[in-house]
Amino acid sequence: MSDFLTIAIPKGRILEESVALFGKIGIHCDELLSNTRKLIFENREQRMRYMIVRATDVPTYVEYGCADLGIVGKDTLMEQEKDLYEPLDLKFGYCRMMVAEPAGLARDDDPSSWSNIRIATKYPNVTEKYFAKKGVQVEIIKLYGSIELAPLVGLSERIVDLVSTGETLRQNGLVEVETIAEITTRLIVNRASLKTKHPRITEIIEGLEKHV
């Protein structure tokens, strides 16, 4: 099986867009979209293997060589800082990582005057580094979901989270005050695999480049 290429892909919209994109370069993996609990799929004819994993686990599987390639959001890569090769921006899954706060607070707030603030987020590493560069002391509360709830119940004054349309923020009375980064989906590669399977991986990268 060492001649197989293994790709780690998360479920959801990224999976659907990834299957469509790979189809454009002749790598057909439509079976990944079937209603099944299978987590590993193989295409022996094309010598490809696919692993369905949690988005936050994709970099780990690639870093340790369980997968040669992975598809994952830039937000996850920024937070985890794994030792990976990141050759390609796939240009889908666009959103923004931003700082938000209640609209009432924002009316009289000046981000340049922040000195000691409390923030709830799924991204403690990114948040800490961002505010350290600004010279702002920050207490970070790590949450795993429904980040918008934190300011509403007094857990934090502000949040750092991903926003696509901003509708969830608006419905919860929050507004964006600063953008930390623009996020898209990336192709990542295990560094050892890039050497041992260089021709096949390079062919995939160059093929995908023509369609993004």
Swiss-Prot record:
Subunit structure: Heteromultimer composed of HisG and HisZ subunits.
Coiled-coil residues: none
PROSITE patterns, per database record: ATP_P_PHORIBOSYLTR
The family this protein is said to belong to: Belongs to the ATP phosphoribosyltransferase family. Short subfamily.
Name of protein: ATP phosphoribosyltransferase
Molecular-function annotations in GO: ATP binding; ATP phosphoribosyltransferase activity
Metabolic or biological pathway, per its Swiss-Prot or TrEMBL entry: Amino-acid biosynthesis; L-histidine biosynthesis; L-histidine from 5-phospho-alpha-D-ribose 1-diphosphate: step 1/9
Keyword ATP-binding in annotation: yes
Source organism of this protein record: Geobacter metallireducens (strain ATCC 53774 / DSM 7210 / GS-15)
InterPro entries, A to Z: ATP_PRibTrfase_cat, ATP_PRibTrfase_CS, ATP_PRibTrfase_HisG, ATP_PRibTrfase_HisG_short
Protein localization: Cytoplasm
Pfam families named in the record: HisG
Domains as described in the record: Lacks the C-terminal regulatory region which is replaced by HisZ.
Catalytic reactions of this protein: 1-(5-phospho-beta-D-ribosyl)-ATP + diphosphate = 5-phospho-alpha-D-ribose 1-diphosphate + ATP
This protein's UniProt keywords: Amino-acid biosynthesis, ATP-binding, Cytoplasm, Glycosyltransferase, Histidine biosynthesis, Nucleotide-binding, Transferase
Function: Catalyzes the condensation of ATP and 5-phosphoribose 1-diphosphate to form N'-(5'-phosphoribosyl)-ATP (PR-ATP). Has a crucial role in the pathway because the rate of histidine biosynthesis seems to be controlled primarily by regulation of HisG enzymatic activity.
GO cellular component, one term: cytoplasm
Broad class of where this protein is predominantly found: cytoplasm
Top-level lineage group: Bacteria
Gene3D superfamilies: Periplasmic binding protein-like II (3.40.190.10)
GO biological process: L-histidine biosynthetic process
Entry's EC annotation: 2.4.2.17
